[in-house]
A protein has these predicted regions:
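Non-catalytic regulatory appendages
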Residues: 4-5, 10-451
Length: 451
């Protein structure tokens, strides 16, 4: 609930090399202790790392039973959306991802030199955002784009804001791919972060993102665009699916499994509070040990209460400021809207509307959903642009270049997301980018030779 101070229940000192199986032992010990004491745990969130996502899957597999909920597909002819809710004892628990981390992941994928986000008649790429940042009336700062802090919450929020969309539609309406990408993904995060939207409106926003992503994946598959180059990273796609399904998991849990009607505050169901606690620890002792942490706990309780009841509002205009904690910001809070749960029929109607919106957005990008959904698509394959040759049969070219390049892109993305701050780290990242450009030029040269 808003204005309820955070309680630090447990802390454990662990090494950095623990696997998801190792962490599951600790997670289950804590969770089982809560359940045995009849404490109602509704959700478990993580920040999107590979280990933590696997840990969530291990937790779901440990459920004693599951409840399957179906949402009618908005197209009217595709399979229903299946939402699986795991139960531990009598308690259902949703698995969520941190929405602010996902917003930064969307931004980092857009800025990545390893991929080009491709839509039917448009693309979304870094240079478009860089051009916008140079304008005198730009809604974003140059520091948001040049030498950016990849963990800067404010920079990501500004990029996906309504002001940015307004500027683009006014000054760069030709950048349709970028406009639609920022709108759809930004609305998905707003479904979690808004303090006033009706729950039914949030349902429609989340489903719109689900259907748009579904159409996007289908388009790339039909057109034979390799997802490794023209779609968001596999990690980003997995986190997005978890966030979408997790929203409905927690919605059904609060609606159907709470003994009394409780308002749903989705922005509180994240890892933000944990990050805030660690940030405060570093303010007290910059490089603290486990012993330091134990002595800090009384101070942390006081500081958490001060932060919660303080009238200070975080500075949304700050640059390169890293994490921006807004979970205690209750401006515009509408508890009535957050307590009004939609019925199954209302969710089905919202699903139809959401599909219609996703369909319209894709038509705006140049291809109708009817063409994408057709059994035998008339969309031309990218491979059809080139003549058939015996190049693939040449034994000198059997060194699985696609797999090697895919691995190379994964390494480049990991380096970019790690935000290297040392001179050696910056040099390594620059060398990888140069190597990526060289590979791309070599590939293009090969294509021209074949033609």
């Amino acid at each position: 609930m808003p204005k309820i101070p955070t309680i630090i229940v447990a802390a454990l000192s662990i090494p950095e090399n623990l696997t998801s199986d190792d962490l599951f032992v600790h997670l289950w010990h804590i969770l089982d202790g809560f359940l045995q004491r009849n404490l109602k745990i509704a959700s478990y969130a993580s920040d999107g790392s590979n280990v933590e996502r696997k840990l969530q899957r291990l937790l779901e597999n440990h459920a004693i039973r599951t409840r399957m909920v179906s949402i009618k597909h908005g197209s009217g002819f595709r399979d229903d959306i299946k939402i699986k809710i795991p139960f531990f004892g009598s308690q259902p628990i949703a698995t969520l991802q941190d929405p602010k981390h996902l917003l930064k992941t969307f931004r980092n994928n857009l800025f990545s030199g390893a991929r080009l986000l491709t839509f039917p008649n448009s693309v979304a790429l870094f240079s478009q955002v860089h051009e916008m940042s140079q304008a005198d009336d730009s809604p974003i700062y140059r520091r948001d784009v040049e030498k950016l802090d990849r963990q800067d919450d404010n920079a990501a929020t500004r990029l996906f804001s309504g002001d940015t969309l307004k500027w683009l539609t006014t000054h760069r309406p030709q950048h349709l791919g970028l406009i639609v990408y920022l709108f759809v993904m930004g609305e998905l995060i707003d479904a979690y972060e808004s303090r006033s939207l009706l729950l039914l409106t949030r349902v429609q926003m989340v489903l719109r993102a689900h259907y748009f992503i579904e159409l996007w994946e289908r388009f790339l598959d039909i057109s034979k665009y390799p997802a490794a180059k023209h779609y968001v990273s596999p990690q980003c796609a997995d986190i997005t699916r978890t966030l979408i399904h997790g929203f409905f998991q927690v919605l059904y849990i609060y609606r159907d499994h709470c003994s009394i009607r409780q308002p749903l505050f989705p922005w509180l169901l994240s890892t933000e509070v944990v990050e805030h606690v660690f940030g405060m620890c570093r303010q007290i002792v910059k490089d603290f040990t486990m012993l330091d942490f134990q002595f800090m706990v009384p101070k942390l309780f006081i500081r958490m209460r001060e932060a919660l009841f303080s009238t200070h509002i975080s500075d949304g205009k700050a640059r390169a400021s890293g994490y921006n904690h807004t979970y205690a910001d209750n401006r515009g809070l509408d508890i009535a809207a957050l307590s009004s749960y939609p019925t199954d029929s209302e969710i089905a109607e919202a699903s139809t509307r959401a599909y219609g919106e996703a369909e319209s957005l894709f038509a705006l990008l140049g291809v109708s959903a009817a063409d994408i959904e057709a059994e035998s698509s008339t969309l031309p394959s990218v491979r059809s642009w080139f003549y058939e040759t015996s190049y693939e049969d040449d034994p000198e070219n059997e060194d699985q270049p696609e797999e090697e390049q895919y691995d190379f892109q994964e390494v480049l993305e990991c380096l970019e997301d790690s935000n290297p701050s040392t001179i050696m780290g910056d040099k390594l990242l620059r060398d990888f980018r140069y190597a990526n450009i060289a590979l791309s030029v070599d590939e293009q040269t090969t294509m021209y030779v074949l033609i």
